[in-house]
């Protein structure tokens, strides 16, 4: 396929997902951890009706069969409840890499790796993801992304695993972080920092409270147009974050990049 076209992006994204899935499977067989692609663990071959482990699925099937990317109700890998079958699907070129620690029931395991520390590590190697959540690092495949480029990402993930497992000193692998607070990070290794962050995530239950915050949508008190008119009329004022309760935001907030 012509890699100047959208089909090329899809092919490369599928190849990268398969590579990470196969690497995860190999490490799992050795009882070792690795990252995993965020997608279904199995897909169905429409010709045979058989279920195939994702890491064994033909690339051509994944690149041409939309059913491979549908979020079906009741599947633990995506965690969404109450969705109708066939209502939504993954965009294969939005490649989410899941860090160890989030269990299929949505609970945090005793140990895990915060995605932020992975992003910081990748950033030092010049790899900048499109988005980072508590447990996932997201990359967008676009025109120009080739095996050479995503291969660099895979090598960086392998490097991270090596440095994490050996608890490499922060001064070596995250020197800017270590230099920003030398007393705080003195003598700490990469795994030390990850374990401390993970313990805080479990204790604070930040994922739970974030989910609660978005579980109930607010009641609109004013249209965006009216709020903007108030802003233009000089009727808006700056307030600190702790003073925003029961106030109407006069300036719109636009999520970017779109679709994420």
Sequence positions of predicted segments:
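Non-catalytic terminal extensions of PLP-dependent enzymes
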Residues: 3-260
């Amino acid at each position: 396929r012509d890699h100047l076209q959208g089909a090329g992006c899809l092919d490369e994204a599928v190849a990268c997902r398969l590579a990470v899935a196969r690497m995860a499977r190999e490490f799992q067989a050795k009882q070792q951890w690795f990252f995993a692609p965020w997608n279904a663990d199995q897909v169905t071959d429409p010709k045979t009706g058989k279920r195939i482990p994702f890491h064994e699925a033909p690339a051509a099937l994944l690149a041409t069969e939309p059913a491979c990317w549908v979020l079906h109700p009741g599947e633990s890998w995506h965690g969404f409840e109450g969705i109708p079958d066939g209502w939504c699907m993954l965009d294969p070129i939005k490649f989410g890499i899941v860090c160890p620690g989030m269990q299929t029931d949505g609970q945090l395991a005793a140990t895990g790796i915060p995605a932020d520390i992975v992003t910081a590590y990748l950033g030092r190697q010049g790899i900048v993801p499109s988005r980072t959540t508590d447990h996932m690092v997201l990359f967008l495949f676009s025109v120009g992304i080739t095996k050479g480029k995503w291969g660099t990402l895979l090598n960086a993930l392998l490097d991270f695993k090596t440095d994490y497992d050996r608890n490499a000193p922060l001064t070596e692998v995250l020197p800017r972080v270590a230099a920003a607070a030398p007393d705080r990070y003195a003598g700490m290794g990469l795994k030390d920092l990850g374990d401390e962050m993970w313990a805080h995530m479990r204790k604070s239950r930040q994922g739970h409270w974030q989910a609660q915050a978005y579980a109930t949508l607010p009641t609109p008190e004013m249209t965006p147009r009216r709020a903007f008119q108030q802003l233009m009329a000089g009727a808006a004022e700056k307030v600190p974050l702790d003073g925003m309760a029961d106030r109407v935001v006069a300036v719109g907030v636009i999520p970017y990049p779109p679709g994420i």
